[in-house]
């Protein structure tokens, strides 16, 4: 059986922690930032965890990360 390929766009966008959780950067921070207040910008800073319902999809997209 051949090796499974990892999706290239997924390996650039997602990060898997040592416990197996998948982290993704917050969306909505590319442009039109002046409309948002400072609190909203601080909330969107950093990473967030994906939901458990998306984990099955992530396992098929990045098979060797888990």
Swiss-Prot record:
One CC-aspect GO term: cytosolic large ribosomal subunit
Pfam families, alphabetized: Ribosomal_L35p
BP GO annotations: translation
Top-level taxon of the source organism: Bacteria
Keyword Signal: no
Signal sequence segment: none
Alphabetized SUPFAM superfamilies for the sequence: L35p-like
Keyword Lipid metabolism: no
HAMAP family xrefs: Ribosomal_bL35 (MF_00514)
Protein name (record): Large ribosomal subunit protein bL35
Organism: Neorickettsia sennetsu (strain ATCC VR-367 / Miyayama) (Ehrlichia sennetsu)
